[in-house]
Curated annotation (Swiss-Prot):
Protein name listed in UniProt: CD-NTase-associated protein 19
Gene that specifies this protein: cap19
Chief location bin: membrane
UniProt entry tagged with the keyword Ubl conjugation: no
Species of the source: Escherichia coli
BP GO terms, sorted: defense response to virus
Amino acid sequence: MNDEFSRASEHIWKYFELHAQQRMTVFNFYIAITGLLAAGIGVTLQQGGKYVLFTSLMGVFVAFISFIFWKLDQRVSILIKNAEIALQDLECQFSNEKLRIITKDNSSNLLNLGISSSWTYGKCFRISFVIVGFTGILLAITPFLMKVSTS
């Protein structure tokens, strides 16, 4: 039983660690891509009317990338949650309740209550995806608004 417990805990922990790291890597990649696109949009906006269509296409691409990365994050979040559930099952076997840190964290009622409470990674990431995606849409229509205002 002890050997099986050790193998199970090692397997579950590696699974959790892999997907938690994957989530952070994917988000870092998202930040890098959208940062480069934002810089490109800034340059094309400075050029004026020459690159109106390109600016709009990059804005649409920012919104599209935000949606794709949001969906990727949803999937990884499910995988992490599965690992947390398995880790909680293992923690139930601990006689010392102070060692049940994942169970304690998941039963916390202090997460995501409001602006001043602690937020989960998921909530922070989702807010980022929405804001950047919405900004991409605004940047897609900005050149046309600038064109109308100068006419």
